[in-house]
Amino acid sequence: MYIPTYEDMLAAHERIKPHIRRTPIRTSDYLNELTGAQLFFKCENFQEPGAFKVRGATNAVFGLDDAQAAKGVATHSSGNHASCLSYAAMLRGIPCNVVMPRTAPQAKKDTVRRYGGVITECEPSTSSREETFAKVQAETGGDFVHPYNDPRVIAGQGTCAKELVEQVDGLDAVVAPIGGGGMISGTCLTLSTLAPETRVIAAEPEQADDAYRSFKAGYIIADDAPKTVADGLLVPLKDLTWHFVKNHVSEIYTASDAEIVDAMKLIWKHLRIVMEPSSAVPLATILKNPEAFAGKRVGVIVTGGNVDLDKLPWN
């Protein structure tokens, strides 16, 4: 198992800079007063495909040699990695095949197709996803770009934390959602070298809390088909992301679906940005654990904004 390095992250940033946005930081006096912390929201929902995953996907696609690239890329994803890989493949002019759960939000499916990705649907379970993908990859021969358990992807995701600490000085902690662990692993990779005094904290839905239970048990515990409003956080940890979680994450906090929806409303209202439920999990956990964040300078990664506006969770 190859563990990506800080140098891999730096190389990834140089590779992807022409194709991504250096996303802005947003703050809210109201949310600072409400939490007792100084919150700095890194708005990855402002990326062209609407999610941070464009970083890792672009690093993987543009790191392929011409012979590999000619065969295209393939992946399985609940949404954002699928759209971001399709976008990166479109930029390079190569094919992209994606396996997605049939229950994935229509907005995410539409985005994949808009960027030229070819979708094969599966049942909303890890086993169905992996079985369906094996068939698709055998038929297409595309390079497998795993949504998170891939050194190229983790190195790319780590560029978000690099920008964050360049934009905001003296962060005591960075909080990011955790599903499979790609973003949190990239954050650990970067901050362990660039800002080792900054704590990395993961935020997870209670109804899909396998990372939390794994963290407490000391080994990977996987749920096959969890259900939560945070549909981007349904996948389990894998060996590579588990390496970063067990060695570098300071804490994992969880929040209920109701708390996640309440936090999502607050962000929509006070930051005035469109973001999806998965992106609200960090604020939900900060609100639920105020003693852990009071008086601290906290970076919060808003991971994506691909939400079906006709199916908002408070409607």
Swiss-Prot record:
Keywords: Lyase, Pyridoxal phosphate
Keyword Lyase carried by entry: yes
InterPro entries listed in its UniProt record: BHydaspDhtse (IPR054856), TrpB-like_PALP (IPR001926), TrpB-like_PALP_sf (IPR036052)
EC number: 4.2.1.-
Cofactor(s) the protein needs: pyridoxal 5'-phosphate
Entry's Gene Ontology molecular function annotations: ATP binding; hydro-lyase activity; L-serine ammonia-lyase activity; magnesium ion binding; pyridoxal phosphate binding; serine racemase activity; threonine racemase activity
Induction description: Induced by glycolate.
Highest taxon listed in the record's lineage: Bacteria
Transmembrane region(s): none
Disruption phenotype: Abolishes growth on glycolate or glyoxylate, but the deletion mutant strain is still able to grow on acetate, succinate or glucose with comparable growth rates as for the wild type.
Residues recorded as bearing N6-(pyridoxal phosphate)lysine in the entry: 53
Coiled-coil segments on the chain, per record: none
Binding sites annotated in the UniProt record for pyridoxal 5'-phosphate: 80, 179-183, 303
GO biological process: D-serine biosynthetic process; glycolate catabolic process; glyoxylate catabolic process
Reaction equations catalysed: (3S)-3-hydroxy-D-aspartate = iminosuccinate + H2O
Keyword Signal: no
UniProt function note: Catalyzes the dehydration of (2R,3S)-beta-hydroxyaspartate ((3S)-3-hydroxy-D-aspartate) into iminosuccinate. Is essential for the growth of P.denitrificans in the presence of glycolate and glyoxylate since it functions in glyoxylate assimilation via the beta-hydroxyaspartate cycle (BHAC).
Note, other: Iminosuccinate is a labile compound that spontaneously decays into free ammonia and oxaloacetate in solution.
Name listed for the protein in its UniProt record: beta-hydroxyaspartate dehydratase
Source organism of this protein record: Paracoccus denitrificans (strain Pd 1222)
